Each structure stands twice: as C-alpha cells, then as structure tokens.
Amino acid sequence: MNDLTKKPILQVLAGETVSPPPVWLMRQAGRYLAEYRQVRSRAKNFIDFCFSPDLAAEVTLQPIRRFGFDAAILFADILLVPIALGRKVWFVTGEGPQLEPFDPRQFEELRLDQTEAVLGSIGETLKRVVPELPDTTTMIGFAGSPWTVATYMVEGGGSKDRFRTRVAAWEYPEAFDGMLDRIADVTAEYLIMQARSGAEVLKLFDSWAEGLPEPLFERVVIRPTKRIVDAVRAAGIDVPIIGFPRGAGTLYPRYARETGVTAIAVDTGVDPAWIQSVLPAGMPVQGHLDPSVLRAGGAALDGEVDRLLDQWAGRPHIFNLGHGITPDVPVAHVEQLLARIRDRS
C-alpha cells in the first residue's frame, strides 16, 4: 500500500491540499532535454523506441533525475493502442504519425486478442522504472481516450478539424460506437496491465475533445471514457484516474460528474474560479500553465505561476501545463518554473 504522506501527488488525488502543490509536466521526457535526444538516437524509429523497455525506462527517469518532479510519467505514445488493434502506425519526421485510414464500418476487423502480446513491453518499462524512483515520486501510466485515438485512425494521422471523423460519427453511429467500444476495451486492458506493472495513477488523454456538440461529446467522449473507468474498476484496480478532455469548455463538469474519473486535468483556456464553482466538491484538478509562457520565461513566467498558485490555493491541485511542453523550451525555464513553485510555502 502506498504511503500517502510520502507522495504529494497521491495526497492531492486523495482530496488533500498540499502547499506548495506537487508538479510534473506533460511530455516532461522529451526533445527539450539533450539526454533524451542522445537516447532517442539509439532507436531506429519512434515506435521501436516506445517498445524498447531499456530505452523507454531511461527517458522516463531522465526528468526525475534532473528536476525532481513529483511524478514520472511512462514514456510511450497514445498510438500504440491502434497497433494492438491490428492497425499499422508509423512516424514521419516533420509530419508526425501516419496510419492507414480506417473505415469505422469495418470495426469488427479490429483485433481484441493481442493486447498483451503487442503491449506487454510497456509493462516491462514500468517494472524497470518503479524501483528507481525516489520514495516521494508517483508513477503515472496513461493511454489515449477512444475518441482521440479514433480521430487518428479515421483521418490517417493528425487533422486540424477531425472533420472526416465527426462526419463518420454522425453518419454511421452504430458502427462508430462499435469502433469506440473496441478501442475502449483494449485501452482498459492496457491500463489494467500498467497498474499491475507498477503505475500508481492512470491518465486518459482526450486531446481532441474540443468543439464537439454536447450530444456528440456525450456519445464519443463521456460514454467510452466511462466504459474504460468501469472496466478498470471491475478488474479490482483502485488507483486514481485523471481525465483530460482538452478543450471541453463548458462540458468539463459533465465529464467530471459522469465518467467516474478521480480528478480532472484542464487546459489553458479554463478560468480557475469558474471550474472550481462547477466541479464536484473537492475534486482534484491538474493544470494548466500555458506552454508558451514556459517558453517565454522571465517575468511573464513568474507572473503566471504566481497567478495560478494564488487562484488554486486551498484546493487539491497538481501543477502542470495545459498542453505538452514544446521541444524548444530552455531547460533554464523549467528550472525557473520549479523554483518559483517550490519557493512558495
């Protein structure tokens, strides 16, 4: 059993207020670190990098050694789940992820029988990382939420507006929901494996939840997220789950109430006073510094850190960004951020 008194993030996720708040950053293991780039050069491609427990464990640990973040987050990618579903995924330098576009009407072709075989190495990464962590550091596992994963599968990669996917969700609702269910079921199995391999917290990233009408948001974001949470709990896994429906706007409260997540992560556009007034009482919140101000540094960074610390004071809060850290952020700015937070007491 985890000793909550030693792990500030677990304290917050249990509903406690910790001052100063614990901090970690999305994409904290990444290209802004020279040591990451050195390890990355040893893998022939990004997918192989993710599936190499030795390399993935090393880059997971790098930001902990350098900065002493309160959490390590598993180094992996949300698009490993489509591989387990039987889809091809590859990364093109300068272009990002590429997939063979998938027709949701063929959802029954998606494999449900090879999750452990394909994703088992991710559990091995966790088993390598956990023994190396300081006693106060929490291990976070994660996966992409079904809607966001589906957008990449249907579009064949990244998309500015996910239009093809949204059309498919309206045009073929039964097939589309069947596809989401298959993604959700494999994702749940994947997260259960992560928890059994040492993850103390799980996070679901719905990076493309923005701009959906409420009926569609309910169908493609809330419903499959709840399906995952329910499956994880039914397997006897009781670790906290953080949900991040980025860009959900006024639908954040519904997501928080209806999915069963323990805590909610919010994006940079969310007003702290508003979200505190509409969330379930005492629900922990993670976020939500603008990554651009971290890149800018200086007085602007100090001012934004102070503003967020003031606005979240007295609440169970984990300090993070509202989106992932960018590759061009100077290490000195991360050090400045941490010093500003940790100097508050």
From Swiss-Prot:
<keyword id="KW-0210">Decarboxylase</keyword>
<feature type="binding site">
    <location>
        <begin position="27"/>
        <end position="31"/>
    </location>
    <ligand>
        <name>substrate</name>
    </ligand>
</feature>
<protein>
    <recommendedName>
        <fullName>Uroporphyrinogen decarboxylase</fullName>
        <ecNumber>4.1.1.37</ecNumber>
    </recommendedName>
</protein>
<dbReference type="InterPro" id="IPR000257">
    <property type="entry name" value="Uroporphyrinogen_deCOase"/>
</dbReference>
<comment type="subunit">
    <text>Homodimer.</text>
</comment>
<feature type="binding site">
    <location>
        <position position="77"/>
    </location>
    <ligand>
        <name>substrate</name>
    </ligand>
</feature>
<dbReference type="Pfam" id="PF01208">
    <property type="entry name" value="URO-D"/>
</dbReference>
<feature type="binding site">
    <location>
        <position position="207"/>
    </location>
    <ligand>
        <name>substrate</name>
    </ligand>
</feature>
<dbReference type="InterPro" id="IPR006361">
    <property type="entry name" value="Uroporphyrinogen_deCO2ase_HemE"/>
</dbReference>
<comment type="pathway">
    <text>Porphyrin-containing compound metabolism; protoporphyrin-IX biosynthesis; coproporphyrinogen-III from 5-aminolevulinate: step 4/4.</text>
</comment>
<feature type="site" description="Transition state stabilizer">
    <location>
        <position position="77"/>
    </location>
</feature>
<keyword id="KW-0627">Porphyrin biosynthesis</keyword>
<dbReference type="GO" id="GO:0019353">
    <property type="term" value="P:protoporphyrinogen IX biosynthetic process from glutamate"/>
</dbReference>
<comment type="similarity">
    <text>Belongs to the uroporphyrinogen decarboxylase family.</text>
</comment>
<feature type="binding site">
    <location>
        <position position="323"/>
    </location>
    <ligand>
        <name>substrate</name>
    </ligand>
</feature>
<comment type="function">
    <text>Catalyzes the decarboxylation of four acetate groups of uroporphyrinogen-III to yield coproporphyrinogen-III.</text>
</comment>
<dbReference type="GO" id="GO:0005829">
    <property type="term" value="C:cytosol"/>
</dbReference>
<keyword id="KW-0456">Lyase</keyword>
<dbReference type="GO" id="GO:0004853">
    <property type="term" value="F:uroporphyrinogen decarboxylase activity"/>
</dbReference>
<feature type="binding site">
    <location>
        <position position="152"/>
    </location>
    <ligand>
        <name>substrate</name>
    </ligand>
</feature>
<dbReference type="InterPro" id="IPR038071">
    <property type="entry name" value="UROD/MetE-like_sf"/>
</dbReference>
<keyword id="KW-0963">Cytoplasm</keyword>
